Amino acid sequence: MSKIAILTDSSCDIPQELAEKYGIDIMSFHILLDDVDYIERESCTNEEFYEKMRAAKGIPSTAAITPIQFCEKYCQYVDEGYTDVIHVPINRSGSSTYNNAVMAQGMLREERPEHHLRIHLLDPHTYSMPFGWYVCEMARKLQNGAEISHVIQEFETQMDKMEIVLGPYSLKQMKKSGRISAAAAVMGELMGIRPIITLIDGKTKVEAKVRGDDKVVPAMVELAKKRSEGVEDFDYMIGHTNIPQKDDLIKACRKAFGRDPLITFPLGGVVSANTGPDTIALVYVGHAR
């Protein structure tokens, strides 16, 4: 009989109650800010971390989960009699974490040469709840008796459709992470120009620029409507850093899409370390790529 573990990392932004409900293991990233090392989901709440970023002199940096840490986790699964682990780390193109998991599989063969653990390593091609939600869906379906091959195929199909539109209201972190140029960040702050950014298949792109904070939400919603036109299984989620504009986005999306979001969720430390502490995100199901 199969015994299946589901493993992800704290970039998934899965709420703790859902992780506990579905038995999902979440390994935490370390985030360094002003020489203080924070362990995501342990050291402070998301809201506390936003405030620390707003008050900080420097820019946060994140450390990938190491091959040794992954190997130790895999060994734990072997020792506990698991037959399979579905491992969904952060987007491969944005972190060395995925490659570290690949290295850990080689280390496991050395540590437990006769092990029979099947490791299903999946690249979500995205960040945060756009994959975290569907990790929960995999776990739910497995609990209801679905075949592991079926839930993996469904997950990968869904990841080929997920798109994110970001609306950052402060640009310091975006500049540091390279998502916008230093010149664009300076001009944006001086003139109130806000970039509308997509994150699709692990890649970011500035799709538009609007002048004034009040133009951000309408531009985000219009872009999502345009890109998702004709999608039969359309749904959406809203991410935020607990700023007032999240309510404007929820209201605008309800009007535009005629339904409530699947979930409204706070952006975690790893994600907000790159987007900044004043960001809203519209996640939606687009066309298959």
What spans do the regions from the language model cover?
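Hydrophobic residues in alpha-helical segments
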Residues: 53-54, 78, 142, 175
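N-terminal glycine-rich anion-binding loop in soluble enzyme alpha/beta folds
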Residues: 5-71
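Glycine/charged-rich beta-loop-alpha catalytic/anionic-binding loops adjacent to active sites
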Residues: 55, 83-87, 111-122, 264
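Mixed-charge interfacial surface used for oligomerization/domain docking
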Residues: 3, 11-19, 24-25, 30, ...
